[in-house]
Amino acid sequence: MKRAAQIAPIPTLALLPCALLTGFDAFDGASLNPSWLAVKAIDGELLVGHRIRVAQLPTAFDASLKELKHLLRLHKPTLVICVGQAGGRSALSLERVAININDASIADNAGAQPLDTPVVQGGPAAYFSTLPIKAMLIALLRAGMAAEVSQSAGTFVCNHVFYGLMHELSKKSIAADKKPARGGFVHVPFLPEQGAPSMHLNDMVAGLRLAVQTALLTV
């Protein structure tokens, strides 16, 4: 009698590796932040064998990195993409470099406005993204999406979080499989109701989804 073929068990979502995306809350008197609306739309999805987890960071220098460090310990992601809003831009901006400086032109949501202070005292002058930003750019452009590689993430909370993320990832492996986690930052434009230039939310969501897929597929 032939033995029945054994079917490999399907791993539960809890056992799958995690990709973490973060967005920010609204700031500077605004009622919304498209970065949060965009990442929230793909929470819980399964992409390239990874479960997508998302979280909102406060637009505050001190609290944002405290929350991010907690999320890294909690989820142990293999991929981290932090997302922020960049008014005045018309494309998804794949950030190349984070610099070790805080120089805020406005106060954050906690009332802090650091000027010419380091993100990490004694840290390197800069960290490069470890995301495959050129592969992500090509994929986005081929899909007909507005995208670019950006050479500056600014000097507000977005750059602060970007630098802090890369500093944490440089110290040790935080991923559940003990392999080095990759990370970086993406800026999204305004939504149409916020002003011009802008991008529709559906396009942001599709672009971020494709960016995550490309990052996970690119060695």
Explain the meaning of each model-derived region.
Residues 183-193:
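An accessory alpha-helical subdomain
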Residues 156-157, 175:
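Generic low-polarity alpha-helical segments
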Residues 2-153, 166-171, 178-180, 198-207, ...:
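N-terminal catalytic or cofactor-binding beta/alpha core of small enzyme domains
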Residues 29, 158, 192-197:
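Short active-site-adjacent structural elements
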